[in-house]
A protein has these predicted regions:
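Short active-site oxyanion
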Residues: 1, 40, 86-89
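Structural motif
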Residues: 5, 35-36, 81-83
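Structural motif corresponding to alpha-helix initiation and N-cap regions
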Residues: 7, 28, 74-75
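Short Lys/Arg-enriched alpha/beta "domain-start" segment
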Residues: 15-19
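Active-site rim helix/loop that mediates acceptor-substrate recognition in acyltransferases
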Residues: 22-40
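Conserved beta-hairpin
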Residues: 34-59
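Acyl-donor-binding surface of acyltransferase catalytic domains
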Residues: 59-119
């Protein structure tokens, strides 16, 4: 999903990461891979049917591209990048820390690296 940033984009970061330590590790690695400060990468969580879900987001041209952390729709993100004339390249591969999320592609842009799930 893609939406514009608003003032309500916030919090619950540590709580989400504490509830899912392994996922928290993945999120931190993802943010580090982006090469941006955590303040510029909004992470927030919410309850959905008693299940805590974490979402990560990447800021691109003042828009937020976000998805469930374990399912990033590659087509949606690629369409977004194309529609906004953002140059990108695609890297395929597996890394041990991310094997549970494979198959996936890495979409590399000047704004950072996006991890996209394949279906």
């Amino acid at each position: 999903m893609i939406r514009k940033l608003n003032s309500r984009d916030a919090g619950d970061i540590e709580y989400c990461l504490q509830q899912k330590p392994m996922f928290g590790q993945f999120v931190r690695i993802f943010i580090k891979d982006l090469g941006i400060d955590i303040e510029n990468c909004n992470i927030f969580g919410y309850y959905e049917k008693t299940k805590l879900t974490c979402i990560f987001s990447v800021v691109l041209n003042n828009l937020m591209v976000y998805s469930y952390a374990d399912i990033v729709p590659a087509k949606e993100i690629l369409d977004f990048l194309k529609n906004h004339n953002i140059n990108f390249s695609i890297m395929k591969g597996e890394e041990s820390i991310l094997q549970q999320f494979t198959p996936y592609v890495k979409v590399v842009t000047k704004y950072g690296t996006l991890l996209c799930k394949l279906f």
